[in-house]
């Protein structure tokens, strides 16, 4: 009132001009106030790069979680309902549940980074199908796979979108009254609502706790105990220097059934093997011959969840490295694996010929192509395990390429995986191949850049790097197929025990009529059967080049499978250059004449390399370890010897101890790190080391304890 009075009092004393000026000023001020009152609030600031990144990466945190999907528009939840029809029993999803209690609850199973399959309480998949429908799917696969996006909201929360991989369309909710899917429909395409009016693509995820877990192998270990350590202290634990995680891709990818992981889960990774092995394993010719010494061996091919006959220690053509089994081995004290990428062009071409399953879309038998694929698979496996455990870098399975990386990974409580190559035609340098220093160098650089750090210069057969350790029988047939010649032998030197060879074409050279034909065409080699023999070939000039380049690059030279002449020549180079990166990873060198370790073994120990016996039951394995430990006694190096499984390398695994029935490994047991481990369960099968030996890689934990 005082202000009004004052204005009026002053106004009475003003001239008309002054009065008009004041009036205009007051009117302008009033108009300004009206404009200020009608102006819209400033829009919120766009999210920062850090906020966008946090929302995007929050998708990783959904792994193995349980959530209800809620509409931000009306607060309703997705629920399953019967829409009728034949597809997926007429079941689909909509947004009509008024509470989380009545909503569908989805288990989020990662398939890769940012990609998930969602299964409800009954194991039905949030899925899509042709032509453009959402349904409660019954099967894993790309139509049940969604790329999930995380989106930052102004209140600091996140919303999530779902892009279907099978149809390449986004999941939507129609909360309005227009269109085929009006009033709560979940859809990907609505021709009656082409502009997607009153629909949304971003949803709230409300945490729940009563989902049905996705099928998976159990670890059966106490996961509460940390395996972290001080990176500056010595590493304690076990290493397996000879494994073949990716051997399911060698020999055309149609020999070893199963995968260590699958985006679609264990039901796909460890499915029935009849698709490549035929009914009752009738087409599993190499597996039956090598594992059971009987090409007519028959077995029940069923896999998950029953596993009536595989995995087993003699079942060489079935997957034993499922990723959860590998994780269990890590929990049991295994700190590092050398995963050898493997190929054998002869066996690959034989398999592609004799097994009809290999006639359709087999992998390339060329060694370099096969190795490339296996490197890709190991990287995919690392990413898959990361996705299961919370995103990039979070998984226990870590590819490493330096000692420092390996030590850091182990200190972080994870497993270090080092890549190597074991192939008879390394770098496409079989006897019949065109191979030069230039082609070798190009391939060497390529695999080094991919993370490979260990190589076998020779494997089963002679190649352009040198002579292989001689073997008769099936391997000698392979030598002939690979090189055009059988093993050409000579009397061994006085320090070396060789192998006995039988004259004639291996396996069939004594068969009447066939023998005469083979003699006629010169395919019945003649050997001195009175004494053990050695390969007459040693290290070639190209082999000298390769070994020196490996030393230049700090790579590990695998000595196994070398002829004694080749091995002696390599050790001369290694000793001259004072190099320690040499290893006999699975006891596949010739022994001394009296059966004791060869001078090559002693040379490896003296240089600071690694010696590892091939695995066997714990009672006999001790002798193999002691045999090599003695070679380190007079050296300055760590007195330690690992064992190698060579699982996946077409070699039988360790059986149970002969006294396991009366003196069994007791379950549960406590590891050196204080982790409690019980019998491993996968699906409906329980594995017990006492009964079946090393049936799969998860039992390495049990074997270490034994």
Stretches with model-predicted labels:
Residues 37, 205-534, 540-548, 552, ...:
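N-terminal hydrophobic targeting/anchoring segments and the immediately downstream early-domain regions
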Residues 18-29:
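Bacterial N-terminal signal peptides
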Residues 31-36:
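Boundary at the C-terminal end of the N-terminal hydrophobic targeting segment
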Residues 121, 562, 587-589, 614-616:
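Histidine- and/or cysteine-centered catalytic micro-motif in compact active-site loops
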Residues 1-14:
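N-terminal secretory signal peptides that target proteins for export/translocation
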Residues 556-562:
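Catalytic beta/alpha-barrel core
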Residues 37-214:
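Lectin-like carbohydrate-binding module/patch detector with strong preference for beta-trefoil
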């Amino acid at each position: 009132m005082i202000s009004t009075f004052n204005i009026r009092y002053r106004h009475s004393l003003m001239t008309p001009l002054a009065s008009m000026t004041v009036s205009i000023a007051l009117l302008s001020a009033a108009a300004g106030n009206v404009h200020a009152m009608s102006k819209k609030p400033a829009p919120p600031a766009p999210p920062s790069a850090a906020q966008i990144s946090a929302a995007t990466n929050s998708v990783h945190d959904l792994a193995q979680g349980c959530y209800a999907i809620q509409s931000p528009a009306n607060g309703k939840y997705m629920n399953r309902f019967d829409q009728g029809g034949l597809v997926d029993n007429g079941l689909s999803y909509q947004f009509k549940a008024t509470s989380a209690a009545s909503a569908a609850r989805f288990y989020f199973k990662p398939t890769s980074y940012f990609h998930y399959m969602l299964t409800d309480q009954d194991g039905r998949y949030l899925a899509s199908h042709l032509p453009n429908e959402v349904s409660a799917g019954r099967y894993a696969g790309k139509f049940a796979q969604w790329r999930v996006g995380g989106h930052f909201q102004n209140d600091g929360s996140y919303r999530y979108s779902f892009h279907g991989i099978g149809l390449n369309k986004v999941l939507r909710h129609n909360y309005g009254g227009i269109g085929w899917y009006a009033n709560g429909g979940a859809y990907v395409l609505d021709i009656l609502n082409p502009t997607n009016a009153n629909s949304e693509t971003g949803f709230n995820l409300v945490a729940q706790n009563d989902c049905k877990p996705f099928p998976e192998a159990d670890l059966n270990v106490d996961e509460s105990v940390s395996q972290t350590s001080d990176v500056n202290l010595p590493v304690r634990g076990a290493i397996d220097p000879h494994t073949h995680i990716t051997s399911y891709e060698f020999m055309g990818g149609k020999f070893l059934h199963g995968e260590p992981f699958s985006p679609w889960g264990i039901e796909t990774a460890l499915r029935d093997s009849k698709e490549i092995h035929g009914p009752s394993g009738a087409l599993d010719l190499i597996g039956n011959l090598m594992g059971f010494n009987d090409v007519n061996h028959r077995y029940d091919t069923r896999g998950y969840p029953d596993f009536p006959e595989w995995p087993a220690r003699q079942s060489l053509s079935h997957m034993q490295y499922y990723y959860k089994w590998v994780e269990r081995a890590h929990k049991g004290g295994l700190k590092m694996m050398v995963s050898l990428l493997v190929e054998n062009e002869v066996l690959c071409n034989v398999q592609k010929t004799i097994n009809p399953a290999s006639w359709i879309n087999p992998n390339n038998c060329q060694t370099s192509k096969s190795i490339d694929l296996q490197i890709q698979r190991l990287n995919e496996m690392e990413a898959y395990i990361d996705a299961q455990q919370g995103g990039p870098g979070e998984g226990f399975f870590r590819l490493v390429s330096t000692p420092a990386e390996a030590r850091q990974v182990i200190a972080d409580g994870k497993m270090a995986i080092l890549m190597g190559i074991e192939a008879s035609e390394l770098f496409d340098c079989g006897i019949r191949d065109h191979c030069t220093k230039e082609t070798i160098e190009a391939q060497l650089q390529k695999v080094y850049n991919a993370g490979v750090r260990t190589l076998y210069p020779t494997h089963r057969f002679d190649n352009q790097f040198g002579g292989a350790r001689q073997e008769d029988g099936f391997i000698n047939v392979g030598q002939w197929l690979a090189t055009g010649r059988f093993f050409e032998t000579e009397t061994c030197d006085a320090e070396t025990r060789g192998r006995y060879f039988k004259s004639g074409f291996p396996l069939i050279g004594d068969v009447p009529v066939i023998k005469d034909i083979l003699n006629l065409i010169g395919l019945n080699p003649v050997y001195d059967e009175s004494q053990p023999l050695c390969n007459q070939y040693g290290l070639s000039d190209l082999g000298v080049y390769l070994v020196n380049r490996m030393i230049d690059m700090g790579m590990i030279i695998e000595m196994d499978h070398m002829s004694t002449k080749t091995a002696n020549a390599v050790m001369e180079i290694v000793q001259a250059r004072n190099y320690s990166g040499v290893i006999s990873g699975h006891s596949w060198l010739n022994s001394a004449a009296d059966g004791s370790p060869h001078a090559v073994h002693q040379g490896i120990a003296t240089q600071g390399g690694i010696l590892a016996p091939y695995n066997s039951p714990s009672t006999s394995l001790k002798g193999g370890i002691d045999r090599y430990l003695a070679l380190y006694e007079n050296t300055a190096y760590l007195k330690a010897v690992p064992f190698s499984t060579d699982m996946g390398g077409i070699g039988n695994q360790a059986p149970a101890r002969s006294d396991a029935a009366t003196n069994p490994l007791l379950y549960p047991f406590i590891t050196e790190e204080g982790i409690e481990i019980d019998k491993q369960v996968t699906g409906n099968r329980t594995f017990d080391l006492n009964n079946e030996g090393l049936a799969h890689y998860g039992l390495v934990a049990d074997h270490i304890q034994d």
